[in-house]
Amino acid sequence: MTALLKIGLVSVSDRASAGVYQDQGIPELQAWLEQALVDPFHLETRLIPDEQPVIEQTLKELVDEQGCHLVLTTGGTGPAKRDVTPDATLAVADREMPGFGEQMRQVSLHFVPTAILSRQVGVIRKESLILNLPGQPKAIKETLEGVKDKEGNVLVKGIFSAVPYCLQLINGLYIDTKPEIIESFRPKSARRENLEK
């Protein structure tokens, strides 16, 4: 499929949405996607408070009305009472993709022991993938790219290595990444050169 990739970026923060401080999640995600993706894409961005009904409605709007293939949230994934992003995400899900949350925690544990407090989830709604990411810019990049040594060799794969193939499976969209940022994985039979035969 050659449709333009549509990505929703949702920053969940009471203080940033109230203007107390500048949101850092959406700019970090946008910059990373511009570096990592080969294919052109369109962004829909939302900055919202930590309110479960608002998060649920925003996710539904991005998938159901805006037609986003991929929605990345940032913030609100911890154990505090106001951290309800995973709860809202699960509430709008058709299917859960537990491997994404497991891998995010695995990556983050290489940097901070408090990664076990994270409740990030990955889900499918209709033909879209929704992923909860951490709120801190450094942690966002680490989660997406994985753990690398000083020479840049990947020690633990980041979650985005599985995103292109997941999108291909759920909605037929084929996207590529720049291997120097994140190498996407798909079986040989699902690679473009074999699909075009």
From Swiss-Prot:
It comes from Haemophilus influenzae (strain ATCC 51907 / DSM 11121 / KW20 / Rd). SUPFAM superfamilies: Molybdenum cofactor biosynthesis proteins. Catalyzes the adenylation of molybdopterin as part of the biosynthesis of the molybdenum-cofactor. Pathway: Cofactor biosynthesis; molybdopterin biosynthesis. It catalyses: molybdopterin + ATP + H(+) = adenylyl-molybdopterin + diphosphate. GO terms for cellular component: cytosol. This is Molybdopterin adenylyltransferase. Keywords: ATP-binding, Molybdenum cofactor biosynthesis, Nucleotide-binding, Transferase. Transmembrane segments: none annotated. Belongs to the MoaB/Mog family. InterPro entries: MoaB/Mog-like_dom_sf, MoaB/Mog_dom, MoCF_biosynth_CS, MPT_Adenylyltrnsfr/MoaC-Rel. Its EC number is 2.7.7.75.
